């Protein structure tokens, strides 16, 4: 067994670099979109949109990669760079939490609960839709696990 293979993949320098660079790009994209988007009441609408889009794309990406074979080589690199890095940096749980807290602090507890529940439910639905799209495209191309 080589020294490199004895380390978990997340401790390999290449893996860390892929996640770091992807995360920087995803964070920059989110920052640019957030700066250009309006705030409604005390929440940033773009945070909701970014998180839903990110969930959808992550579902599609992971399903597409899974259908193409084991999580190794190029597929692993794509998952680490695009999934963990870009989409991890693009989506934002912290801004979602701040938006929810902002509604609650502004004495809109119901709005905070609704915003949180809607974000989670719609994000989960978007993720499942992304998986379905990845599976449908994979079936059309004749790709199977």
From Swiss-Prot:
This is Fluoride-specific ion channel FluC 2. GO terms for molecular function: fluoride channel activity; metal ion binding. Pfam families: CRCB. The keyword Metal-binding applies. PANTHER family: FLUORIDE EXPORT PROTEIN 1-RELATED (PTHR28259:SF1). It is a multi-pass membrane protein. The chain crosses the membrane at residues 16-36, 42-62, 80-100, 113-133. Belongs to the fluoride channel Fluc/FEX (TC 1.A.43) family. GO terms for cellular component: plasma membrane. Na(+) is not transported, but it plays an essential structural role and its presence is essential for fluoride channel function. Fluoride-specific ion channel. Important for reducing fluoride concentration in the cell, thus reducing its toxicity.
């Amino acid at each position: 067994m080589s020294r490199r293979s004895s380390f978990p993949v997340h401790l390999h320098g290449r893996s860390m670099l892929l996640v770091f660079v992807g995360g920087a790009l995803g964070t920059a994209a989110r920052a640019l979109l957030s700066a250009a988007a309006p705030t409604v009441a005390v929440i940033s609408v773009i945070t909701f949109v970014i998180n839903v889009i990110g969930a959808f794309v992550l579902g599609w990406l992971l399903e597409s990669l899974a259908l193409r074979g084991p999580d190794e080589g190029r597929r692993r690199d794509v998952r680490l760079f695009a999934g963990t890095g870009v989409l991890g940096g693009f989506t934002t749980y912290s801004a979602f939490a701040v938006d929810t807290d902002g509604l609650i602090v502004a004495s809109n507890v119901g709005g905070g609960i609704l915003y949180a529940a809607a974000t989670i439910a719609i994000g989960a639905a978007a993720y499942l839709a992304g998986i379905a799209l990845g599976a449908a495209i994979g079936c059309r191309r004749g790709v199977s696990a």
